[in-house]
């Protein structure tokens, strides 16, 4: 199962306590938009909706609980998953935390979550950027296998794909979320130097990257941002 923590929005951070609130089972664009606005703020995110998601997974959540180094600022942040985002703060005492999300095959992948965010870029701005951390249950036991959790971020046009179900290869020419070495954010593509057990401390996951920044050039006006959590195999 893949989990991605996104940077916080505006607010007052809570030092203790807090909660994780699932938005995944709600079809209301209002609730999905509310979660997405923790990534970029209400002035930047006009609306948001799922372009794809597993039918049984709680794949999107807003959290006010300190976890994995988030929130970086403000009081809340977004959690995007291809399984169950509400399990993120569970103790790591299971070999495989997750859920049977029932995702159909999409472009050669299973359990695909695509969040479509309609954003507005003000005049004078030319960069879209957000901070994130990738966490996974498939490290290290599934490194090099067909099960290859991943995270992609695209702008306006979505072109990622995999060769076929059972093939771990991910092609994403328009992706702008990479690790510090420029690799795709996947279990197979992000090596031991970037995914470690220590970085997942305090979560239910077995491995995580450091906090990373995704950035891409953008022109003023309306755009569509598409963060994607997926699982080839």
Tell me the role of every PLM-derived stretch.
Residues 1-8:
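Bacterial N-terminal signal peptides
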Residues 16-233:
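Aromatic (Trp/Tyr/Phe) and Gly/Pro-enriched flexible surface segments
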């Amino acid at each position: 199962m893949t989990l991605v923590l996104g940077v916080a929005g505006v607010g007052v951070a809570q030092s203790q306590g807090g909660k994780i609130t699932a938005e995944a089972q709600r079809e209301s664009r209002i609730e999905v938009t509310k979660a997405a606005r923790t990534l970029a703020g209400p002035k930047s995110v006009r609306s948001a909706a799922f372009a794809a998601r597993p039918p049984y997974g709680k794949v999107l959540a807003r959290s006010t609980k300190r976890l994995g180094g988030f929130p970086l600022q403000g009081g809340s942040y977004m959690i995007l998953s291809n399984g169950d985002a509400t399990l993120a703060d569970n103790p790591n005492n299971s070999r495989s935390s997750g859920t049977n999300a029932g995702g159909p095959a999409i472009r050669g992948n299973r359990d695909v979550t695509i969040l479509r965010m309609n954003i507005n870029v003000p005049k004078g701005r030319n960069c879209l950027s957000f901070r994130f951390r990738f966490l996974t249950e498939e490290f290290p036991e599934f490194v090099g296998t067909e099960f290859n959790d991943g995270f992609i971020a695209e702008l306006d046009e979505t072109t990622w794909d995999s060769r076929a179900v059972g093939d771990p290869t991910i092609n994403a020419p328009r992706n702008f979320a990479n690790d510090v070495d420029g690799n795709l954010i996947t279990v197979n593509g992000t090596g031991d130097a970037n995914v470690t057990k220590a970085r997942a401390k305090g979560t239910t996951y077995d491995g995580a990257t450091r906090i990373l920044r995704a950035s891409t050039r953008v022109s003023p006006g309306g755009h569509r941002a598409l963060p994607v959590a997926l699982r080839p195999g």
